[in-house]
Design a protein with these regions (language model features):
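A broad, structural micro-motif
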Residues: 48-49, 159, 176, 182
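N-lobe entry segment of adenylate-forming
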Residues: 1-49, 53-68, 90, 142
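Conserved AMP-binding/adenylate-forming
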Residues: 45-48, 62-106
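Structural core segment of the AMP-binding/adenylate-forming
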Residues: 94-163, 172
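Conserved pre-ATP/AMP-binding loop-to-beta segment of ANL
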Residues: 32-35, 148, 168-186
Length: 186
């Protein structure tokens, strides 16, 4: 009645990886230009992002986060399911930070509790979740930075995710300035 799985089906080769960062690099190397994500953009057009492009976008966005001083921060991600949410989540995983995914449908009280208890210093949100965060910010003194996956509301500590990624791309393309110390040897 049942087949013996050990005899009839060989086990698949499994790769081990050292870190999430290494997993992104290996995916880009192994699958290169194959589609990692496909999603609809405004107008109904389907956009495809390859493994290599995704790794490069994660690198750029992560570099933008480091430029803001958030490379090792606790960062919450809240919003509806979209490519930007996935990019934000994977980016924080690939940095030295801690990601805090928050369900967009939680009440204000539950969201506030998670943001406070997790010591979140920044939140990456979709435009639809920004209004909820605006209501909660006065009661969250540790939360200093809001990064919007759309166009952010005006204000101190507000950034657009795409602008941060673009800044990260510029920094990655430019390399280190000659004035940046690389080593201090005595």
């Amino acid at each position: 009645m049942y087949k013996n799985l050990k005899e009839n089906y060989p086990l698949y080769e499994v790769r081990t990886t050292e870190s999430f960062r290494a997993l992104l690099d290996e995916g880009a190397e192994l699958f290169g230009d194959k589609a990692a994500f496909r999603f609809k953009v405004k107008g109904g057009e389907i956009k495809s992002v390859s493994y290599r492009e995704f790794r490069d976008e994660v690198d750029a966005f992560g570099t933008g986060l480091y430029e803001l001083g958030l490379g090792k921060a606790h960062i919450a991600v809240i919003g509806e399911n979209c490519y930007g949410w996935a990019r934000a989540y994977f980016t924080v995983l690939a940095t030295e930070g801690v990601v805090i995914p928050i369900d967009k449908d939680l009440s204000d009280e539950e969201t506030q509790y998670i943001l406070d208890f997790s010591d979140a210093e920044a939140v990456i949100c979709t435009k639809n979740s920004e209004a909820k965060l605006d209501r909660l910010l006065p009661s969250l003194p540790k939360l200093k930075t809001v990064i919007c996956l759309g166009t952010p509301a005006e204000g101190e500590g507000r950034y657009a995710a795409d602008a941060l990624a673009e800044k990260g791309r510029e920094l990655l393309a430019g390399g280190y300035p000659e004035s940046t110390p690389a080593a201090v040897v005595y």
